[in-house]
Amino acid sequence: MNVITNFSPLLKDKELIDDLPIVIRVKKFDESAAKEFSEKMSLAHNTGQPVVPVIIDSYGGQVYSLMSMISDIMHARIAVATIVQGKAMSCGALLFSFGKEGMRYMDPDATIMIHDVSSMAIGKVEEIKADAEETERLNQKVYKMMAKNCGHHEDYFLDIIHEKSHADWFLEADDCLKHNLANHL
């Protein structure tokens, strides 16, 4: 994740640079990316910009880091526009759905992939059972949130994933429009 910082060499005045719009790029979902996302969201609030563009091009990552980013978006005082370039897979697809209604953009050649939350549980039987319960709780939570964001009943995406035998579900841009994930191509 990075903020666009390659300004014109004609901009010498630091105050002008501080007021430029912040654009957030999300390429991965881990603790450092979540921290950087939070910092950039805070900076965006101080620019006076009416919208924070969040550009997603990611294979996914850690769900807890995604939850931190979602929290930042939900507590934002300005609108968040999400934009998919290339791919938004797993956590990337979920984050995409948190763009403000009417502000979810997708490149016509981009792909989204949705699947069950996964776990790398190892350990004693009871630890694995506890991890499986937490994985199921997270799975239910994030896909119900996604369904709400897209104007569907809460089990909409969970039902489709179940119908697809819990396999990875790849969607092209046109399919994302049909499911109200994307608002614009």
What is the meaning of each model-derived region?
Residues 37, 54, 96, 112, ...:
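Terminal peptide-recognition signature
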Residues 37-58:
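A structural preference for short, pocket-lining loop segments at secondary-structure junctions
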Residues 121-185:
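Charged, glycine-interspersed solvent-exposed loop segments at helix/strand-loop junctions
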Residues 23-28, 55-59, 126-132:
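Second-shell loop/turn segments in exported
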Residues 7-15, 43, 72, 78, ...:
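Catalytic phosphate/metal-binding cores of nucleic-acid and nucleotide-processing enzymes, i.e., regions
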